[in-house]
A protein has these predicted regions:
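N-terminal leader/linker segments that precede catalytic domains of diphosphate-processing enzymes
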Residues: 1-80, 87-101, 105, 109-117, ...
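NUDIX/MutT-family hydrolases
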Residues: 147-188
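Short, glycine/charged-enriched secondary-structure capping and boundary segments
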Residues: 81-83, 130-131, 150, 171
């Protein structure tokens, strides 16, 4: 599908009800499901963050989804694949401001160049105690990305067709900073394993797109 057709169809996503936990659970590790169950009725004070789920055309007008591999550092999300985004700062007016600011800082896309389509369902990440708000956006006339090398190891430009292909969903055995030898559902895209909160966000997005494409 070319980007022009995609933009026409995705505009209708605003009218669809969000799927939330129902879709998140499909790509959630079993340990995550247990953790979320334990905190469901607690009054935990969560940190806030936001990410931008960005679609754009490549040089052939093919639709791509932007992911990035984070650098290795001392933290639970070290060397993981995710969306541009990060924690709320005092200068941010709201969570959308956070997502736009972080997207500019991490991959060099100006806020004014992003058409924000809608929010997706927020998701809580127990290991880091962040509640993350995803936003869906379009980058119509992309310039070359400029990565923040201190945080971003590389960009992963995923063709829409690969993202939508169910054959690219796998079960992967992983060891993380907080769990060892666990089997997790994941997307295998461009040679990278995408799991955890990012995969859970993508699960909802994919279910919504299936209703439109």
């Amino acid at each position: 599908m070319n980007f022009d057709d995609f933009t026409k169809r995705i505009s209708k996503i605003k009218n669809l009800p969000l799927l939330g936990e129902e879709s998140h659970i499909k790509m959630a590790p079993s340990i995550r499901i247990e953790e979320l169950g334990k905190i469901k009725n607690t009054t935990l004070v969560k940190k806030k963050a936001a990410v931008m789920v960005l679609f754009y055309p490549d040089k052939n007008n093919v639709v791509r989804l932007l992911l990035m591999l984070r650098n290795t550092y001392k933290g639970v999300h070290s060397n993981q694949v995710g969306f541009p985004g990060g924690k709320v700062e005092k200068i941010d007016k709201n969570l959308l401001d956070t997502a736009l600011r972080e997207t500019f800082e991490e991959v060099g896309v100006p806020s004014k160049s992003i058409e924000t389509i809608r929010e997706l369902s927020s998701i809580y990440i127990p290991p880091s105690n962040f509640e993350v708000q995803p936003y869906l956006g379009l980058y119509h006339n992309p310039l070359p990305f400029v990565i923040e090398e201190a945080e971003v190891a590389s960009l992963i430009e995923v063709p829409l067709l690969d993202f939508m292909n169910d054959k690219n969903i796998i079960i992967k055995n992983l060891s993380t900073s907080y769990a060892t030898n666990i089997d997790v559902p994941a997307f295998k895209l461009n040679g990278y394993v995408v799991w955890g909160a990012t995969a859970m966000i993508m699960s909802e997005l994919k279910e919504l797109l299936k209703q439109l494409l």
